[in-house]
Structures are given as C-alpha cells and as structure tokens.
From Swiss-Prot:
Organism lineage string: Eukaryota, Fungi, Dikarya, Ascomycota, Saccharomycotina
Membrane topology classification: Multi-pass membrane protein
Lumenal topological intervals: 30-38, 146-162
Gene source species: Yarrowia lipolytica (strain CLIB 122 / E 150)
Keywords linked to the UniProt accession: Acyltransferase, Endoplasmic reticulum, Lipoprotein, Membrane, Palmitate, Transferase, Transmembrane, Transmembrane helix
Protein name: Palmitoyltransferase PFA4
C-alpha cells in the first residue's frame, strides 16, 4: 500500500491531475474540435468527477453499533483495539482507528477506508474518471492524428498552446485511464463475486491451506457469493440510484445472505474464514484450535492433515492472517487492516 508522510498528499495529487486535465482541456483543446453540446457534457462529467471524489473522501465507511452483540449461533469476532465484538466481514482500520463494516481496503488517494457505506461513492468516482478521461483520451488521439496529417502546413495556422497541451495530455490521460481502469476492473470483478479485496486475499490464503491439506476443500468455499446481480446490487445499490451522488448500498453491513456453503447440513451457520476460533474477552479463548474446529462440525485431523503437534504449530504460525503473504507479496496490513481481532 502506498503511504505518504502526510496522508493528505495522496488527495492533493489527484486534485491537481483532475483540475489540470479537465480545466485546460475544456478551455484550450476541446472548444476548437467539438460541439457546444459535447463540451457541455464533458464539463458536466468533470463536475461529477469532483462531486463523487469529494463524497468518497468525506463519507465514512460505516462502523458497527456500540451495543453490537454477536448472535448465539454465529461467529464471535472481537477487536482488541475497540474492546468490543464486531460483525462478520468487519476489520479494524489502522488509518481511521475504528472497525469498518465490510472493509474493502484503505485508499491513500481518498485518505479514507472503503467499506460498506462508502463503496458506492468510491465506485462512482472510479467510473466517472474512466468515462471522462476515456473520452478525453479518444479526442486527444483524434487531434494528434490530425496534427500529424497537417504537419506540413505553416506553424502560424496552429494554436501553439493547444498543440503543446495536446501532446502533454495524451500520455497523461492514458496513464490515468490505464491505472484507474485497472483498479476499476479489480473492484468490479470482486463486486461481481460478492467479495472484498481483503476477502480476495483471504481466499488466496485459504487456498494455500487447502493445498497443504490444512483446511478441507469444502470449508474453503466462499459463502457470500450469491448471484451476479445480487452481488452487485448489494455492493452499490440499485442501478437506478447508482448514478445519483447519494446512492447507497443494500443492507446494513452487519448481516449478510449466504450461499449453501455457509451452513451445515443441519442449517447452522459456519464461520468464515474456516480457521477462525471464537474468543471470550472476559477469560481465555472459548476453545483451543481443535475444540473450535469440532464446534463447527469439522474433524481436526482432517483439517490439520494429521500433522504432529510441533509441525502443526509451525504451519499454524506461517499461515496466520498477520504473517501470510500472497504471490504479490501483500500482507493483510497492506490493505489498511490493523490485525487486532481474534
């Protein structure tokens, strides 16, 4: 995760880029080559970039209620920083110092943590940037090709300011479109699968446990993947309200619908990730690792592969959530999570 000595530097940089590309293009480049209606649409789209960006910065991601108590038959996650229980899919944000409902990641470019409540605003910002900069990039490509075709004409026929800005803005707009586009695709794909970036990392960790026969393949299935459109609507709300600056996600960020892999044959909810063990803050862990697995209807020898006690401890330490890295070298802390939960 990118970090800055002053976190607001991460906000100032996009502001400079957005202002420079949108303002100078609207004043010096586009008026000479597009209709007034097209220019007006570009200005409106640029305004929506600013509006969605400001909202993504100031709207909090959502935190659990102070009086939250876990259901008796559900998983019990406890935050040592907040000294309180928290709902499933909730993590403690190191930057904000609070637990965040359905936390996705901490974004240095908004200086805000993306969670259940502000995910639609964050996604709206990405989409408006992609559309606005994508349009500008196409227009710049057309303009540069025309300038190349007319390169033999006298220089006094060209507006030098426009030519210089077009040449500079072409690679700049491509860079913005490429980088933001990759992030948009990543977030959208996760959204389609009903998963957050943190949970995607978690799935990679669980898959490594399956390969080492530390976790059974059945228990590795992700329980929150319901159906394509249900997943999308749960994350960003109705497609009719998504384009509105105040559009909200579905649900409360505390309880979530699960697929069949999230329940036992008797209909009891299963914990995910599967190596989670409940914790009692008043005493000691409610169960040790094996007892916790049995409580969830699993046989420890099946889950832990029948390895010896010493090797089991070494394997367990290596695959702990605060130690493990994926193939890209990312740790849980790289998503802005302060690992204080048990």
């Amino acid at each position: 995760m990118i970090t800055f000595s002053n976190p607001w530097i991460g906000v100032i940089i996009p502001c400079i880029i957005i202002f420079t590309l949108s303002t100078f293009s609207a004043i010096y480049i586009l008026p000479h080559h597009v209709s007034n209606n097209e220019l007006t649409l570009f200005i409106c789209a640029s305004a929506m970039v600013w509006i969605s960006y400001i909202i993504a910065i100031i709207v909090p991601p959502g935190s659990p209620p102070k009086n939250y108590t876990p259901p008796e038959n559900g998983m019990k996650m406890y935050c040592l920083k907040c000294k309180a229980y928290k709902p499933e899919r909730t993590h403690h944000s190191k930057a904000l110092g609070v637990c965040v409902l359905k936390m996705d990641h901490h974004c240095p470019w908004t200086n805000n943590t993306v969670g259940h409540r502000n995910m639609p605003h964050f996604m709206r910002f990405l989409v408006w940037v992609d559309m606005t900069v994508g349009y500008l990039f196409i227009r710049l490509c057309i303009r540069i090709m025309k300038l190349w075709r007319d390169k033999h004409l006298p220089s006094y026929l060209f507006d030098k300011t426009e030519v210089i800005l077009s040449i500079v803005f072409l690679p700049a707009s491509f860079f913005v479109l490429f980088t933001v586009g990759i992030l948009t695709i990543r977030v959208f794909v996760n959204m389609c699968n009903g998963i957050t970036q943190i949970e995607s990392w978690e799935c990679d960790r669980i898959e490594s446990l399956v390969r080492r026969k530390i976790v059974t393949e059945e228990r590795a299935e992700f329980p929150y993947d319901i159906e394509l459109f249900t997943n999308i609507f749960n994350a960003v709300g109705s497609p009719l309200t998504f384009w509105l600056p105040w559009g909200q996600p579905r649900g409360d960020g505390i309880t979530f619908e699960k697929n069949e892999s999230g329940y036992t044959e008797e209909g009891e909810p299963l914990c995910w990730p599967p190596d989670h063990v409940d914790y009692d803050p008043e005493n000691v862990p409610l169960q040790n690792l094996k007892d916790g697995l049995r409580r969830r209807g699993e046989e420890p020898d099946c889950l832990l592969g029948g390895i010896g006690a010493g090797k089991m401890q070494a394997e367990n330490d290596f695959y702990k959530r605060d130690h493990w890295r994926n193939v890209e070298g990312e740790k849980l802390a790289d998503f802005g999570v302060e690992h204080t939960d048990i």
